């Protein structure tokens, strides 16, 4: 399992003193000096505050809990025995290696056993894990593991396709390159036909 308990609120800072907002602003001023800028010039006076506020929003996933989102499920599926598929869930994240953006879409399917969840909660689970420092591989596994733990479905399929700005803006600088990762559990792991059907639906034009 890939630390879906990381879906509980900020386990690293539990019991630790979190830096004050002013300390974050000071760190950003230091960064501006390091790149050769003058943090006291007019255009940059409010930049440390703005960046600190932006980071608070961009990484809000550390303060959100999978349990709070998936803790309430519906246990009456009324005889429905086909997959539930939510595709084209847009997200943004940041790579944990360079803190540079990742932009992409998630496609998720699960085959209910006795539990279903509101469709909006599927999208919220993507946000919980994407709004953190991530690797795409870990994020894919975390989403699948979270759904496995709380829904206990017959099968789960997760496909994420994303563009990594660390490949576009630096390093190899390959614009438009897309990374695809998948995670299959249960019936989707065992049944090649189910996998193929999922992939066909994902690739089908909306």
Curated annotation (Swiss-Prot):
Zn(2+) binds at residues 95, 98, 166. PROSITE patterns: GTP_CYCLOHYDROL_1_1 (PS00859). This is GTP cyclohydrolase 1. Keywords: GTP-binding, Hydrolase, Metal-binding, Nucleotide-binding, One-carbon metabolism, Zinc. InterPro entries: GTP-CH-I_C/QueF, GTP-CH-I_N, GTP_CycHdrlase_I, GTP_CycHdrlase_I_CS, GTP_CycHdrlase_I_dom. GO terms for molecular function: GTP binding; GTP cyclohydrolase I activity; zinc ion binding. It is an enzyme of class 3 (hydrolase). The lineage of its organism: Bacteria, Pseudomonadati, Pseudomonadota, Alphaproteobacteria, Hyphomicrobiales. Pathway: Cofactor biosynthesis; 7,8-dihydroneopterin triphosphate biosynthesis; 7,8-dihydroneopterin triphosphate from GTP: step 1/1. It comes from Bartonella quintana (strain Toulouse) (Rochalimaea quintana). The gene is folE.
């Amino acid at each position: 399992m890939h630390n879906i308990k990381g879906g509980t609120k900020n386990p690293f800072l539990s019991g630790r003193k979190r830096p004050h907002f002013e300390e974050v602003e000071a760190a950003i001023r230091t960064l501006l000096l390091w790149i050769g800028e003058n943090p006291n010039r007019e255009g940059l006076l409010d930049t440390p505050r703005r960046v600190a506020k932006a980071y608070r929003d961009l990484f809000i996933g550390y303060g959100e809990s999978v349990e709070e989102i998936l803790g309430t499920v519906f246990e009456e599926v009324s005889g429905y025995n086909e997959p539930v598929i939510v595709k084209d869930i847009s997200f943004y994240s940041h790579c944990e290696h360079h803190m540079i953006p990742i932009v992409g879409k998630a496609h998720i399917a699960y085959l209910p056993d006795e539990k279903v969840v509101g469709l909006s909660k599927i999208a919220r689970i993507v946000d919980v894990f994407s709004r953190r420092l991530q690797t795409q591989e870990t994020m894919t596994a975390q989403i699948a593991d979270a759904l496995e733990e709380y829904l206990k479905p017959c099968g789960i399929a997760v496909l994420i396709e994303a563009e990594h700005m660390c490949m576009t803006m630096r390093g190899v600088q390959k614009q438009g390159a897309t990374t695809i990762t998948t995670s299959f559990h249960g019936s989707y792991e065992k049944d090649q036909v189910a996998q193929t059907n999922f992939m066909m639906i994902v690739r089908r034009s909306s």
